[in-house]
A protein has these predicted regions:
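Residue-level signature of mid-helix packing/kink "hotspots" within the transmembrane helices
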Residues: 15, 43-51, 101, 134-135, ...
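Juxtamembrane intracellular "pre-TM" segments in multi-pass secondary transporters
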Residues: 172-208
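Cytoplasmic helix-loop-helix junction between adjacent transmembrane helices
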Residues: 92-131
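Helix-to-loop junctions at the C-terminal end of transmembrane segments
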Residues: 50-60, 253-267, 351
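Helix-loop-helix hairpin linking two adjacent transmembrane segments in secondary transporters
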Residues: 126-169
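Short amphipathic helix-loop junctions that connect adjacent transmembrane helices
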Residues: 19-32, 222-238
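C-terminal transmembrane helical hairpin of 12-TM major facilitator-type secondary transporters
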Residues: 268-312
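Conserved MFS/SLC helix-loop-helix module at the cytosolic interface between two early adjacent transmembrane helices
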Residues: 47-86
């Protein structure tokens, strides 16, 4: 329960800041490409820091790494709120990205604390905390932005600091000492970490699916405020409440539905069905003429994401030894970060040069590819039938 609260409060801060980041960036430069590059910088620091934090959590435990990430988030949001120059804004983004390992470390914590049979449900609860944070965070950010653009970031900084103090007092350790393993520092760089997990033949295809799915998702998240403003004239408050709606959908899916569906259908069917929903609804986002219609479309997209991501993570985790869970989650974070380096920049270029719908049409195509790759790994001999049912 404490871990749920930790992730929830952390994601409130994240949810406050992320929908407003394009508007912070707009104080210093304009254009979708610049916003995309800023998102890519954040992801590049995640890419560098994720495997390092994962390795540290395998060596020293999950607790100290979680606390480090919370403290880093507090300082980064403080810098963002106080930024008066482009250099300080960039520094805030760099620090936020480098210490953004809370979710990956929490997933490793869940892997330590659950059986293989219960892992998808445990990861779904972490996803629900993520979603609840995205309900409260954007709504708070939208309201606070009416006061000033600095207020949301300063409030997020205070939340992260409070979370750090609370965690320091009450968070227990989950990673048992006999499972801890010293890893040479040179092996904690993201390139070698990616190379090692890609050598794990039993999860290689699924890791490719993780990359493709998150390329699509990263482009959507970073580009959506620009898309909604260009097509529907939405401003900060409208975007903030829309992100809150997405959070509600994530909570319903990952907090309730996946726990009911997983015993009945299993991770494989949930993953295939979720990917099919995501690909279809990304295309519908690109084609929708109305902001009102966007709500049910993105609601179904969030349902698909909420089914696919915990199921995919659980399948990969179940194929990995207990002593390597931290490095696995760090490696997954590196893949996510690589997607977030490329996704926002590519979405910005597509938006500026190919048109408003382009990032979402490309995202739908990438998700179809993820569905094909997943089917080839999980459904040998049944791929065609499974794809037909999805």
């Amino acid at each position: 329960m404490f871990l749920f609260v930790t992730v929830f409060v952390d994601m409130i801060g994240y949810g406050i800041v992320v929908p407003l980041l394009p508007f912070y960036a707009g104080l210093y430069a304009s254009g979708a490409v610049f916003v995309g590059l800023l998102g890519s910088l954040y992801a590049a620091m995640q890419f560098a820091g994720g495997p390092f934090l994962g390795g540290l959590s395998d060596r020293y435990g999950r607790r100290p790494v979680l606390l480090l990430c919370l403290l880093g988030a507090s300082l980064a949001y403080l810098l963002l709120g106080l930024a008066r120059t482009l250099a300080v804004l960039v520094l805030a983004v760099v620090l936020a990205g480098a210490t953004s390992g809370t979710l990956a470390t929490a997933q490793a914590y869940i892997a330590d604390s659950t059986t293989k049979e219960d892992r998808a449900r445990g990861l779904g609860l972490i996803g629900a905390a993520f979603g609840l944070g995205l309900i409260a965070g954007p709504a708070l950010g939208g309201l606070l932005s009416l006061h000033s653009l600095s207020a949301p970031a300063l409030f997020a900084s205070t939340l992260a600091l409070t979370n750090f103090v609370f965690g320091n007092l009450t968070l227990p350790e989950s990673h048992q000492p006999h499972l801890r393993k010293r890893v040479p520092l040179l092996r904690l760089n993201p390139i070698s970490q990616l190379g090692r997990i890609l050598k794990m033949r039993n999860v290689r295809a699924l890791l490719v699916a993780v990359l493709l799915l998150n390329l699509a998702f990263a482009g959507l998240v970073s580009n959506f405020p620009l898309f909604s403003h260009a097509r529907f004239g939405w401003e900060t408050t409208s975007n903030a409440f829309f992100f809150a709606f997405v959070g509600v959908c994530a909570v319903v899916t990952q907090g309730f539905l996946i726990g009911r569906f997983q015993p009945r259908f299993g991770e494989t069917r949930l993953l295939v069905g979720g990917l099919a929903l995501v690909s279809l609804n990304l295309v519908l986002v690109a084609l929708t003429p109305s902001g009102v219609l966007l709500y049910p479309i993105v609601g179904l997209l969030a349902l698909g994401t909420g089914l696919a991501i915990p199921s995919l993570t659980a399948i990969i985790s179940n194929r990995t030894p207990a002593e390597a869970q931290g490095r696995l989650m760090g490696g997954l974070q590196a893949i996510l970060s690589l997607a977030m380096i490329l996704g926002p920049a590519l979405a910005g270029l597509a938006f500026d040069y190919l048109g408003i719908p382009a990032p979402y049409l490309i995202g739908g195509t990438l998700t179809v590819l993820a569905l094909i790759v997943t089917g080839s790994d999980l459904l040998p001999g049944q791929k065609t039938e499974a794809l037909r049912r999805a």
